[in-house]
């Protein structure tokens, strides 16, 4: 019964506040994937300072300053290398990034552990998964340092209110299971944002339903060991 928190705001004080907020129960709150501005002059200092608390385990890349030219900034690559050298993780929120970006980063930094958020940015419509998305998922998954979170299902649904039946989400979940397998899929609650689309219990029932026919070892890896 432990939790890795994702994420604070990009303010340093908010990252510190979250760590302080949960320090009373270190056995339950075992990690924070924080938010820092990659490619900025103080990134390395802030990451070093925050990581003095061992629960600060990684950074989520959310915004994309400079748009398409973001990865032309060598400071970005220097900071990503710094994360890798520290053996910390990089979460990638797919709203501003593509699976091609994931593939590029993973090839250039093969020792950096990458976690794609929110079912790899799938557009879920309750029908067979988009072939272009399938191809992009398989390409990214060929890199052994790339992992994927099953999170944000209700938010990725084109139909709102979001359906609560497994069959609506299963085409995309099948693709992710085939591509990443039991060792590189990770559960993410996306709480409290999940509550915009339904209750946490409804979300958990969908995910549990998908894993009902998987082995106990697979379920344990997905729900906690892979994290």
What are these model-predicted stretches?
Residues 18, 32, 59, 83, ...:
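Divalent metal-coordination and catalytic microenvironments
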Residues 1-2, 174-175, 179-186, 195-227:
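Mid-to-C-terminal alpha-helical segments outside catalytic/metal-binding sites
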Residues 4-7, 149-152, 186-188, 223:
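Short beta-strand segments
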Residues 1-86, 131, 167, 205-207:
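Mid-domain alpha/beta scaffold segments of enzyme catalytic cores
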Residues 57, 70-186:
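Catalytic pocket-lining loop regions of alpha/beta-barrel enzymes
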Residues 22, 26, 51, 106-107, ...:
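N-terminal cationic-hydrophobic initiation segments that often serve targeting/anchoring roles
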Residues 10-13, 39-41, 64-66, 97-101, ...:
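Active-site environment of divalent metal-dependent phosphoester hydrolases
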Residues 17-20, 45, 49, 101-104, ...:
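Alpha-helical elements of Rossmann-like donor-binding domains used by nucleotide-donor carbohydrate transfer enzymes
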């Amino acid at each position: 019964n432990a939790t890795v928190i994702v994420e604070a705001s990009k303010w340093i004080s908010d990252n510190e506040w979250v760590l302080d907020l949960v320090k009373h129960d270190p056995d339950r709150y075992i990690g924070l994937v924080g938010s820092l501005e990659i490619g900025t002059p103080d990134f390395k200092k802030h990451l070093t300072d925050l990581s003095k608390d061992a629960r600060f385990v990684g950074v989520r890349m959310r915004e994309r300053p400079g748009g398409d030219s973001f990865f032309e900034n060598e400071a970005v690559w220097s900071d990503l290398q710094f994360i890798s050298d520290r053996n910390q993780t990089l979460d990638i929120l797919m709203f501003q990034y593509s699976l091609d970006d994931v593939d590029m980063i993973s090839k250039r930094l093969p020792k950096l552990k990458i976690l794609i958020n929110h079912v790899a940015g799938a557009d879920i419509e309750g029908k067979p998964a988009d072939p272009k998305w399938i191809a992009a998922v398989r390409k990214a998954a060929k890199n052994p340092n790339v992992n994927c979170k099953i999170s944000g299902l209700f938010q990725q649904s084109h139909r709102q209110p979001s359906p609560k039946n497994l069959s609506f989400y299963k085409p995309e979940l099948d693709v992710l299971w085939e591509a990443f397998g039991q060792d590189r899929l990770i559960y993410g609650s996306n709480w409290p944002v999940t509550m915009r689309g339904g209750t946490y219990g409804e979300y958990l029932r969908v995910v549990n339903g998908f894993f009902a026919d998987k082995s106990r070892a697979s379920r344990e890896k997905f729900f906690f060991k892979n994290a």
